[in-house]
Amino acid sequence: MSTSLLKLTGITRRFTNGEQDVTVLKDINLTINQGEMVAIVGASGSGKSTLMNILGCLDKPSAGDYQVAGRAVGKLDNDQLAELRREHFGFIFQRYHLLGDLTALGNVEVPAIYAGKSRLARRQRAADLLTRLGLENRLHYRPSQLSGGQQQRVSIARALMNAGGIILADEPTGALDTHSGNEVLSILRDLHRQGNTVVIVTHDMTIAEHAQRVIELRDGEVIADRQTRPEEATASSPEAASSPATSALNQFKDRFIDAFKMALLAMNAQRMRTFLTMLGIIIGIASVVSVVALGKGSQEQVLANINSMGTSTLEIFPGKGFGDMDASAIQTLRASDIQPLTQQPYVHSVTPSVSTSVTMRYGNIAVSASISGVGEQFFTVRGYTLERGVLFPRSSVDELTQDAVIDKNTRDKLFPHGEDPIGQVILVGSLPVRIIGVVSKNQGGFGSDENLNVWVPYTTVMKRMVGQSYLKSITVRVKDNVDMSIAEQRITDLLMQRHGTKDFFIMNTDSIRQMIEKTTTTLTLLVSMIALISLLVGGIGVMNIMLVSVTERTREIGVRMAVGARTSDIMQQFLIEAVLVCLFGGIAGVALSLAIGVLFAQLSSNFAMIYSSSSIIAAFLCSSLIGIIFGFFPARRAARMEPIHALERE
């Protein structure tokens, strides 16, 4: 006794055309048993293709009940319908519907990917099926390299891949010559003898007569249902596709790899369009990374300038602030303030400063130079490095010695032929001084680093050069791990107690550092926000192109759904493509930014862009996130398509 496999009861299908409803199928009642070979025949517009689409779960009836192997179809969601197509149906289309970027072997494997078969098992079965159909020498040919008959054989092999047992053939010979058409019909008869249920949809009664049973449709109604010949002896059930079970993780991995490969193929097929789409991401990422690197570089440069003044230092000046017109008349900042400051527990070192500009002579060389009177701790406070000789000690300050320390600029100017300056006597104004040491040039200090600097004990400058008893400034270096603001307040209290009034002001280099860090961070953030606009524009471009890609590949979407792709599979495929476009754009953008940094370093010797791993990682994450956000809507649009509408899309 035959087993009912496909059962339709009262099936009606209506379509809305503008304001008018068109009924394509009218109260169809059919039962197709397991192992039957049935032909559904009718003229164009009879509803035969619509009936096949409902049979294959590619379309849903407007009314009535449809069961597949006793399972009601009407209440199933899209993923359950996809599962039904994977497990029970194989489709043979008139126009083959092969994926052009895949080989014959790859096309046949597609249903097994969505069925969760292992890679080795599906590759072996696909090769076996193609070999049985006479394509053993065409396994790695693409559809464009195959004849129509060969493409249809690949389509048949794909239909058999999951061994669902039900073959739905829509005009399988319609696009073939007579010889190829007869070969396809012969294959279908062989499949029937092997126990497969074969349903052929055709308008040609000659083709229909090859079936055991012919169902005629006219204007959406069954007008005839007859046996053409007695039932042949067939296998009780079709050959099963045996394959080892795979874990859910491996199934997901295989589907992901397939989606990844298809994304790469799609990008490669439209290389120029892909590049132009990436361009917005490339420019955006390069802009953001470069701006951050530029901001970091400028911040480090400015902080280096501050450090050149001495780390953790407080500068004490007479007056109420820079630009105070009365500052020159204030003479209360004196050498006697140094000792009390030095004795404070939070103070590391103290150096006074008094300076003047004079003409400096050595032999027949005369130059203008800045003469600074400083204490013995000046070089420690400022962080200068001794290149040669010695620094003057405390005794030089006490004894008003005429010892001098010069910088490398002064050495190069006064001793251009490489003479050793140590022990040489130079004339500073009218005061002869003996050079005892050379310190390295101050890198990154405020002002020009080409100045000629000479340092002598401040007592010598005050008594023997400028004839004044007050100081221009005092620099205090605070010990490490001491809060600068607290130290500033303590020094303020101490000097106010000594002077009786606040006739001085203090420049806190730590406050300047914090202010500059905050300012550069704000500016970097501001410019980065501007650069992010280009990323946003690039993301919109990605979304636009992905929408175009979805439209162009609508038929591919339909084919994948027909062979069992889930909604998540379709969405994943297009989402991966969008993410890859943005990720590759991000990589190219970072590379472009690094190239800009190299070029910038060649053009600027004393300033460099500083890249951080965090900004580069953030760039990759940002580009991937853009791919996900702007790729989501096109991917969702693709995943929401109805299989039949996608297949019919030109």
From Swiss-Prot:
Q: Which organism is it from?
A: Pectobacterium atrosepticum (strain SCRI 1043 / ATCC BAA-672) (Erwinia carotovora subsp. atroseptica)
Chain segments annotated as transmembrane: 275-295, 523-543, 580-600, 615-635
Q: Which residues form the ABC transporter domain?
A: 6-244
CDD domains on file: ABC_MJ0796_LolCDE_FtsE
Q: Which GO terms describe its biological process?
A: response to antibiotic
Residue span of region Disordered: 227-246
The Gene Ontology CC terms held by the record are:
plasma membrane
> What is the enzyme's main class?
translocase
**Function comment:** Part of the tripartite efflux system MacAB-TolC. MacB is a non-canonical ABC transporter that contains transmembrane domains (TMD), which form a pore in the inner membrane, and an ATP-binding domain (NBD), which is responsible for energy generation. Confers resistance against macrolides.
Show the Pfam families listed in the entry: ABC_tran, FtsX, MacB_PCD
Membrane topology term: Multi-pass membrane protein
Q: What is the name of the protein in this document?
A: Macrolide export ATP-binding/permease protein MacB
**Which UniProt keywords are listed?**
Antibiotic resistance, ATP-binding, Cell inner membrane, Cell membrane, Membrane, Nucleotide-binding, Translocase, Transmembrane, Transmembrane helix, Transport
Ranges of biased composition (kind: Low complexity):
233-246
Q: Spell out the subunit comment.
A: Homodimer. Part of the tripartite efflux system MacAB-TolC, which is composed of an inner membrane transporter, MacB, a periplasmic membrane fusion protein, MacA, and an outer membrane component, TolC. The complex forms a large protein conduit and can translocate molecules across both the inner and outer membranes. Interacts with MacA.
